Design a protein with these regions (language model features):
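Repeated scaffold domains used in trafficking and secretory/extracellular systems
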Residues: 73-79, 118-124, 166-172, 223-228, ...
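Beta-propeller blade signature
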Residues: 146-150, 198-208, 251-258
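Residue-level detector of Asp-centered blade-edge/turn motifs that repeat once per structural unit
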Residues: 81-82, 127-128, 174-176, 231-232, ...
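Blade-loop segments of beta-propeller domains
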Residues: 70-99, 105-125
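Surface loop/turn motifs at the tips and blade-to-blade linkers of beta-strand repeat domains
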Residues: 67-71, 111-115, 160-164, 217-221, ...
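Asp-box/WD-like beta-propeller blade repeats and closely related beta-sheet repeat scaffolds
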Residues: 116-122, 135-174
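N-terminal export signals
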Residues: 1-5, 9-30
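Short, conserved, GDST-rich strand-edge loop motifs in beta-rich repeat architectures
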Residues: 135-138, 181-199, 239-249
Length: 362
């Protein structure tokens, strides 16, 4: 339940939120003459120490341009395709999402969770930028909800979708405008799981009107589907958290194409063990799939054609992964930024940011 104290705390924190330039900040597009080094390309959440958190706008190499304080620890960021709005979502079970202008640094809106609701840390804009979809849950049951927020109405909640399962996490928009939802299947009290013996994870496809179009399940019900990406076409990549026996190491990645079945990506059990039962971020190019594990301090690259692991590399607190202009960018809680187009061809830079969880490409 949302209390007046919760609202006051979040609103008080929000009042102090103003973008702080880290480097000279160019708001013009590259076509207007701004150099790549000061043009916003990436946004992610960061830890600032002492219980302080921010959303950080960075250039194409992950070097910070500006940062915006946020009320509590953040998780995922949704980028509007038709404006310079970005929405940062609180880490689950989240109390808020905050919308800001990534060019000007202006805070647009702070949305606080509704009664018997919490946010799961992810959201996505519709292709026309008119709606924002957020993964939410009923706090007493973890029953999944997609909250629909109207941008033109100041991010007012105008609708809810449900009926696709318990514990949704990431939602992405497909090229046809439909939603793909990673449904973890886990009922939680706070962050404590309550139904591991009966969890029902799935990948669910939902229309913009809330109609359940398709739902596919992995054979192993202990694989909680968490994070998603798509390849620019109809293939969805799913990253899992394994909730089974601690000494078992199943595949944590799967692919699904409309009308087909899940296909697992392959690695040896000892290689999966490096990921410590958890995939954080996923990104895909035409040829490669990349996935990070902060718990395993590593990332892997798979061939999309063969579905075999072709590179496994160490990266301390490996977190965000995006595809930017045909090249992968990876972030790290230790501040490292890795640029990589294909296996074993990479460069690394050190940023001043303690990156936390995901990156989104503008």
């Amino acid at each position: 339940m949302v209390t007046d104290t919760t609202r006051r705390t979040l609103l008080k924190a929000a009042l102090g939120c103003a973008a702080v330039p880290v480097l000279p900040f160019g708001c013009a597009s590259r076509k207007d003459g701004a150099s790549a080094s000061n043009y916003p390309q990436l946004i992610g959440c960061a830890l600032n120490g002492r219980g302080q958190y921010s959303a950080v706008v960075a250039d194409e190499y992950g070097m910070p341009l500006s940062q915006l304080p946020i009320p509590d620890r953040g998780h995922g960021v949704a980028i509007c395709p038709t404006s310079s709005h970005a929405a940062v979502f609180a880490r689950r079970p989240g109390d808020y999402f905050m919308v800001f202008d990534y060019k000007s640094g202006e805070q647009i809106k702070l949305v606080v969770k509704g009664n018997n609701r919490h946010f799961y840390g992810h959201g996505v804009y519709s292709l026309d930028g008119k709606l924002l979809y957020a993964t939410e849950g009923k706090t007493d049951s973890s029953q999944g909800v997609i909250g629909v927020y109207d941008v033109a109405q100041g991010y007012r909640k105008v609708e809810e979708f449900s009926g696709f399962g318990i514990g949704p996490h990431e939602v992405i928009i497909m090229p046809d405008g439909n939603l793909a939802i990673g449904v973890g299947g886990v009922h939680t009290d706070g962050r404590t799981p309550k139904n591991l013996d009966s969890m029902q994870p799935s990948l669910s496809y939902v229309s913009p009107e809330g109609v359940l179009l398709d739902q596919v399940e992995l054979l192993d019900k202990k694989l909680s589907i968490r994070h998603l990406a798509h390849d620019g076409a109809e293939t969805v990549l799913c990253g899992q958290q394994y909730r089974g026996e601690p000494d078992e190491y199943p595949s944590l990645l799967a692919m699904h194409t409309k009308g087909g079945q899940f296909e697992s990506l392959n690695a040896e059990p000892e290689q999966w063990a490096r990921f410590n039962h958890y995939i954080a971020s996923i990104a895909a190019s035409d040829d490669w799939i990349i996935a990070t594990s902060p718990r395993g301090n590593c990332y892997g690259i798979w061939s999309k054609e063969t579905k075999e692991l072709v590179e496994l590399s160490a990266l301390s607190d490996a977190s965000g992964a995006v595809l930017l202009d045909g090249e992968f960018r990876l972030s790290s809680g230790a501040g490292s930024v890795v640029s990589q187009r294909k296996p074993y061809e990479k460069s690394s830079q050190q940023s001043s940011v303690q990156w936390d969880n995901h990156w989104s490409a503008i």
